[in-house]
């Protein structure tokens, strides 16, 4: 048996001694990944985002350390370590670039969510609400249930009246801003219940912050370039 091989007995002893600990750690890891969504638990969501944000610098540091260890020792692994370092750095830079491009449109911290590729923006009672989504939808549905406003099933605001449903909804992505106009609705003013459906009408380099008016203001029509 070579010196680099690990005896099966040592592996068995390690698993026997640390089985419960690894079971607990992996179970917690699964819970954080599966239920780490902001609509379920803000605590788990915060832990999940912290893990994702820490992985980039950790992986980059490990790749750089591997380059240092394999330099002038194993040129094959040194080459792979250099390649992994470059790939990790490029992915990390791309994340920050896309996050800042999205942030300049909507001015919300959701732009730095690693899981977010688009943000739905709307305004009710003068307050802007944002909903992060994986991709820009082709249509957006607002549902009002006894004054509770939901966007595609996600609770956004309470004590909303049917007359306050916006005439348009904005969907911002890193590369463009999509304006979705209201094309249909069905409301009941007595029970403050109903729905409104919005589809894509135009897109461009607009601000992703919804205005209080029913149409885009002149300020929002200006190019939002850095």
UniProtKB/Swiss-Prot annotation:
Recorded superkingdom: Viruses
Entry keyword Transmembrane: yes
GO molecular function terms attached to this record: structural constituent of virion
UniProt-annotated location(s): Virion membrane; Host Golgi apparatus membrane
Virion surface side: 1-11, 63-75
Transmembrane segments: 12-32, 42-62, 76-96
Keywords: Glycoprotein, Host Golgi apparatus, Host membrane, Membrane, Transmembrane, Transmembrane helix, Viral envelope protein, Viral matrix protein, Virion
CDD domains, per database record: alphaCoV_M (cd21564)
Region feature Interaction with N protein, mapped onto this chain: 200-216
Ranges of the Intravirion topological domain: 33-41, 97-226
Main location: virion
Pfam families according to UniProt: CoV_M
Membrane-related topology note: Multi-pass membrane protein
One GO term describing the cellular component: host cell Golgi membrane
Its biological purpose: Component of the viral envelope that plays a central role in virus morphogenesis and assembly via its interactions with other viral proteins.
Assembly, per entry: Homomultimer. Interacts with envelope E protein in the budding compartment of the host cell, which is located between endoplasmic reticulum and the Golgi complex. Forms a complex with HE and S proteins. Interacts with nucleocapsid N protein. This interaction probably participates in RNA packaging into the virus.
Family recorded in the similarity comment: Belongs to the alphacoronaviruses M protein family.
HAMAP family: ALPHA_CORONA_M (MF_04201)
Protein name, per record: Membrane protein
Gene expressing this chain: M
